């Protein structure tokens, strides 16, 4: 029976062996269907129809079942002769790779035939009934059974195909069994067993070839891969790139071939400017940006944003910044509030919390790990020295492995410093973010350490170290390096705003901390020392820093000046400290001759005679005074002193007005009053020019006085020690010697000269006064009734000696000593004299005022 219309494909029939049944093979024709449950009709013809020869054009064979699990059934139509005998049995084996397990014997005409065959590891039920040959999937991979009575009711679509089953080897063929204990499968060929072993989960089954080196642990599926792996231990790279100039080597030929593909594509994209070639168009576009300034055609449409971009992808990435609030992926780790616009970025961020770094650099002796593949690839550029980002500035030539590094480098060519330190008080700026990061670590390390503040009152800069503060003072405030330790010393003086009375104006533009210091610069105890100095009546004024706070009135270079010493003020022991009285400069009107009082005699003096010890640094007279500019800051409120007119005649330097008030006794000496009337001005008390040394009588008379004004070129530790010792002795003695000293005091005036042995004042005579400061400073009231104003020029005739310095009292300007004016604030230490009873009848002397000139102070 021919059914050419329903044939699936032509099939060839194999050679017959000994008149036996022919082996049916699958034809090469197209299949009629591919869906599950679809039937295929095949026409099979027996050898009796046309003789023993093969008839390939008439014997189609069934195709193997499709891979879908659906229980495909194959209906094979056979033309079987009526008088078929037993030797006409057919062995149905459609596929050459399948081995039949049962031979289906030919039955008599009209009899039913059933059996089981295995095709591609799948058991099929074979039924031949009344000329119709049926193949159907078995319900389960069970042993083959020949039960014709149970199989007629089996429908083709009711069976489920099973892919796994033992491969039965044909008789006489070697069998390769699976070595797994729970697997009993066997295969006819070795490569089939290898493929089957890959399905098992054990390491031995998947990778049986282990590396023999200790500590390696690698295993492979084939011996070739193990051999290739062993070459990596020996650092062997036998496969070299043949392209000239490349020189790269590889461990396998596969890696070499993959590398060669890159060389083949290098010449595909060529730059028209520099003729450089690139493997991809994207790399060519990236390269061309270095030749031309790229256009930015893509502009952000968000309201208020005017940014433009080169590519669309860059614009899209920017747009996410405007819509981050709409969809954000927040980190769920406790204490972390970071948000990301993509889930993949959040996933990478979470690895920073978990410590997972799955991407490891395989370079030699590197071992760096990363949270993402992009960071690993970026890191590998360092090993390959891939500096693809080159600075476009002509003459620079620097290249970088990362684009952000090039961007940060480009800022250095602009000369700007956009990165500013956010710490309050720190104004440091940097051109690179990395420099700011390094700088910020200093603030983190010095959180608990005290900060050094600039000692200049108008500057609020803070510094982490004293070295930085000193460099700032020298660079910004033009101070000398040797003055910085004196500026650092804290001042125990009360600010001028607290000391000034309602009728006085506050000091302006003067830094008291820079002018005065209560302790030496190298002293370690500042607070305790200042309290002790105030209690003892001793205070040291550092006048070496005066020039830096006077606005340039003094020369900055003091090489031509003499040695500069501190100013030591020793208050009288009988006078309690008070902040409401002028500064006490002395307690007696006794005047000394030049060279008549030495430092050695000061130790033997009575403490009552030394009421105030003042050490002023003055310039050597042998040196020329530098040219000075008249000061515009000095004002003389009230009446103008007489010495001002005398000073202006020479035009050398202005005067620093320091009125000195001389309080007289109730019964002044007539000679003094007569001298004042004849001169109509300040008392002409001038130091004698005699250089003879006074005798013991003069010293005893000096010691009998109530006090004196003594000038010494001190300032060293020896001078301070003498001052302290004198005050201590004076406190121990008390005021007993002061009462008897007033009775023996005498005053004589001869030709306008006062001789120290014969000139004495009363018990309550003293030098007190108020220093005048620049404009806006302290005001000096007009001389009250009963007060005399004298002019005291400070001179130094013998600076190299150890003797005392002379003090001249004269209303006239010295012809051979130039004056030197210093704008010196005075709120240092104020003392007041206790007014004794009967101190009401003071004689009034109307004197406009006078000055004290401090020369060569810096």
From Swiss-Prot:
It holds the Pfam family zf-C2H2. GO terms for cellular component: nucleus. Keywords: Activator, Isopeptide bond, Metal-binding, Nucleus, Repeat, Transcription, Transcription regulation, Ubl conjugation, Zinc, Zinc-finger. The keyword GTP-binding does not apply. It comes from the Eukaryota. Coiled coil: none annotated. Self-associates. Interacts with ZXDB and CIITA. This is Zinc finger protein ZXDC. It comes from Mus musculus (Mouse).
